[in-house]
Amino acid sequence: MRLETHMDSDVTVLAVAGSLDSATAPDLREHLGQLVAGCGPVLLDLSRMLCLSSAGLRVLLVICRQAERNGTLLTLAGMPAEVRAVMAATGFLEFFAVADTVAAGVQALAA
C-alpha cells in the first residue's frame, strides 16, 4: 500500500493505493489517525485501492470514530465498485460521508 498526502482547497487529501489488509492497516491507522487529530477536513481518496479486508474495515471504523470525537470532517471518495460493494454489504457506508469523486468530495468539504 502507498499513501500520498496533499492539500486541495484547505482539505487534506490522503490517497491510498494498493490493498488495505492486516499487513497494511496499521500504517493507515497511524497516518490517518494523525490527520484526523485536528488539522481540518480530511478526504480519503480510495480511487486506487485494490482490496479491502476486514482489518481494513476495522481501521476505517476506528478512524471514523476518532474523527467524530475530534470534530474532524472525514469523507471517503472515489471508491472502486468492489470496495464500495464490500462497504455496502457490511453496512459500513452508513458511517461515512461518501463522494463519488475526489473533486466532489473536496468541494463538499471546502464549502
Question: What is the predicted role of each segment?
Answer:
Residues M1-L3, R29-E30, V106:
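Short low-complexity stretches enriched in small and charged residues
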Residues E4-H6, A77, A99:
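General small-molecule cofactor/ligand-binding pocket signal
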Residues D8-D10, S47, M79, A103:
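Conserved catalytic submotifs in the C-terminal HATPase_c
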Residues L14-V16, L44-D45:
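Conserved beta-strand segments of the P-loop GTPase G domain that flank and frequently precede/overlap
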Residues S22-F96:
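Amphipathic alpha-helical interaction surfaces in cytosolic regulatory modules
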Residues A97-A111:
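A charged, well-structured terminal subsegment
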